[in-house]
């Protein structure tokens, strides 16, 4: 595990941009595509700022999924896709709309909407992309970019939620999210933990109390802690000094320039 702390968010963004470019280039060189899953929240803004400082990224070879998504229209202010479209997909040239995988808007016309159907259809999109390249039971993303809530949740994997026990489905519905909107879909824990690389991006003083628990407490059952602990050699944290204020200094590493 590598935890990188920076004096301000702009430096977090710069390092994240360099990290993502490196992962993109290595993946494209290895198998011709860069498979990525994004979260919402503050992450897209930080990522967009970081990508803007990089040159030569082959966005046309990015296959983009969402680590979780709210079951709302694609132009809704709560949609992770809408946020990423505004800040990233519309801003940088090269993205192929066919390679940006959203929830199926046709399923949102059902009354009532069935979150299980939305999750199942999204899983079919994963199967279509990964079936030819992966013989394992779960897809193996090149990179997952995740956030971490003040409660230690990530994606829509919330503490003590039954979805944490799901070990068959790749995508699961969540119909009782503790934060609105309540209906969502999320990648399941086995999918997240099988990624080639995972990067958490967490900033602000509001995260300083949770980070020691998810990073340094190896008995924690919080989702972000479980993911980190199961992927120590493949997990990186990009944080600012406000968020890392309560971490042991020995936990921090210098980001390679």
From Swiss-Prot:
GO cellular component, one term: nucleus
Record EC number: 3.1.1.31
Pathway info: Carbohydrate degradation; pentose phosphate pathway; D-ribulose 5-phosphate from D-glucose 6-phosphate (oxidative stage): step 2/3
Alphabetized Pfam families for the sequence: Glucosamine_iso
Gene3D superfamilies noted in UniProt: 3.40.50.1360
A GO term for molecular function: 6-phosphogluconolactonase activity
Source domain of life: Eukaryota
Matches recorded under SUPFAM superfamilies: NagB/RpiA/CoA transferase-like (SSF100950)
Catalysed reactions, as listed in the record: 6-phospho-D-glucono-1,5-lactone + H2O = 6-phospho-D-gluconate + H(+)
Any GO BP annotation: pentose-phosphate shunt, oxidative branch
Record keywords, A-Z: Hydrolase
Major enzyme class: hydrolase
Functional description taken from the UniProt entry: Hydrolysis of 6-phosphogluconolactone to 6-phosphogluconate.
NCBIfam families found in the cross-reference section: pgl
Family named by the database record: Belongs to the glucosamine/galactosamine-6-phosphate isomerase family. 6-phosphogluconolactonase subfamily.
Record's protein name: Probable 6-phosphogluconolactonase
